Amino acid sequence: MDKKKALLIVFIIILLIFLGRPILWYCMRPDGATMESREEILNDIKDGTRWTITTERLVEGYVISGAVSDRGEAMIAVFEPKENGKYKLQTATRRDKEEIIISGSIINDVWYDFIWFQGASTERAEIIYTVPNVTSQSSVYLTDNDTIICSPTTYKDYTLQVTYFDSEGNKYE
């Protein structure tokens, strides 16, 4: 009888180990509730690349993050709200830091264009939407605080031209 009890105890311990690991892994996953947690989520995207979030903004409850990597890249990441203040990565667009990132996502049934540039210190950006058979529309945004531009649009067929300007008038396209 003692041998059966010992085998039962060993079996239960082995079962707890096998069941406990996935449960522990699930509980320790980053939940996106803090900037540090969202960085962990970004660091899981690509092996070996370390991301640091440098700017964030809220758009209708979604967190839009701008991050830079240890490999000279920049990224716009969109985090979708979940229950209890948690966030899930919805989309991420990565480019070389010297390039202007143009990305987009649907938030609450509205398409948003997201634009961010890490290549130089800039003061403003001019965005021109060109729509067939419609007069082009231009908007100017201040960008002196590492701002991610979030531009809602109802256009379905359009082109987008973005030009950043620094304090000396230099253009970045």
Predicted regions mapped to residue ranges:
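N-terminal hydrophobic targeting signals that begin at the initiator methionine
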Residues: 1-2
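Hydrophobic membrane-insertion alpha-helices, especially the h-region
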Residues: 5-24
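N-terminal export/targeting and maturation segments
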Residues: 18-92
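Short, surface-exposed beta-strand/loop "edge" segments at domain boundaries and coil↔beta transitions
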Residues: 62, 70-78, 98-100, 124-126, ...
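Short proline/glycine-enriched turn/loop motifs at strand-loop junctions of beta-rich domains
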Residues: 72, 118-125, 155-158
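Exposed regions on extracellular, virion, or secretory-pathway luminal proteins
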Residues: 83-86, 95-99, 133-134
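Extracellular ectodomain segments of secreted/surface proteins
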Residues: 91-116
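Ser/Thr-rich low-complexity repeats and stalk/linker segments
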Residues: 126-173
